[in-house]
């Protein structure tokens, strides 16, 4: 029930990764990267499908060898989500996956080779209508920039990015997006701010090598949150040393928190105290797992007592306010029923699913009316 975020997004050029629009006001795409061996086709396909199920818009796959490129061909045939091939060192691999229908090429110009090799990749991408992501990383800056700046700085990342943007401009190729990633939050944020002022191309956001599931999520939320709140960013990846599925979940959580893009349930829950009338923590944890399949955007407040419960319920799609033995259930700000505290999880799950079904049907009717 909360309004859309009052964020003025940076104007950027529109490109497409497969059928996913990027830039020019398109929804911010959430992506992840497989961590299986690409040559293990079955494992990689299974992981990509798991990422699709939790809402991944785009999936990146590392293609380090020609054997991996041959595996990529088989993988591409078995999945629906657009795939980005991550290419380093050997430009010929980029040419090979282009033959196999890759949706986007991610190259690091600092290690892909000389200008002639970059030209060959760009010409191939142009012929096959494949966009490119220029991926600049603080950990792999060109040697001359390392010597010039002494260490990774925002200016160094910007210069690296602009060097390769200018190269693509000279080749008259504009179907690309750019990233300037670093593991340091402030370095990454300032680099993106500088780049956003220099080009109109879409920007792919990320805090690279952010860390484990908890620390990486925190660093990404801070870094990406700062940029997104300033209107910077057209696609994002939360990089975690964890199951890639968690990257998608955290990515959507960041967008939901900023009210930029909603998918699934936004749970609002109190941290609990001695006033709670039912097990709030257990209820929230159980419902988050049980309701992962719900993609309908809605706010659900679960508050253990009457101090803040009614106020949160007023601005939630569904809200529960703790009471003695039974807790009040609100729908769209109106108190509707009381739920047994001892059976809270089952009852609330049923109410949420029913509400999601009603909302989905209402949206379906609205779409049909627009199409008429």
From Swiss-Prot:
Signal peptide coordinates: none
Binding site for [4Fe-4S] cluster: 270, 273, 305, 312
Note accompanying the cofactor annotation: Binds 1 [4Fe-4S] cluster.
Listed GO MF terms: 4 iron, 4 sulfur cluster binding; 4-hydroxy-3-methylbut-2-en-1-yl diphosphate synthase activity (ferredoxin); 4-hydroxy-3-methylbut-2-enyl-diphosphate synthase activity (flavodoxin); iron ion binding
Family: Belongs to the IspG family.
Stored InterPro entries: Dihydropteroate_synth-like_sf (IPR011005), IspG_bac (IPR016425), IspG_bac-typ (IPR004588), NO2/SO3_Rdtase_4Fe4S_sf (IPR045854)
Recorded metabolic or biological pathway in which this protein acts: Isoprenoid biosynthesis; isopentenyl diphosphate biosynthesis via DXP pathway; isopentenyl diphosphate from 1-deoxy-D-xylulose 5-phosphate: step 5/6
Obligatory cofactor(s): [4Fe-4S] cluster
Name of the protein described by the UniProt record: 4-hydroxy-3-methylbut-2-en-1-yl diphosphate synthase (flavodoxin)
EC number(s) recorded for this UniProt protein: 1.17.7.3
Organism: Citrobacter koseri (strain ATCC BAA-895 / CDC 4225-83 / SGSC4696)
SUPFAM superfamilies from the UniProt entry: Dihydropteroate synthetase-like, Nitrite and sulphite reductase 4Fe-4S domain-like
Function field: Converts 2C-methyl-D-erythritol 2,4-cyclodiphosphate (ME-2,4cPP) into 1-hydroxy-2-methyl-2-(E)-butenyl 4-diphosphate.
Any single biological process term in GO: isopentenyl diphosphate biosynthetic process, methylerythritol 4-phosphate pathway
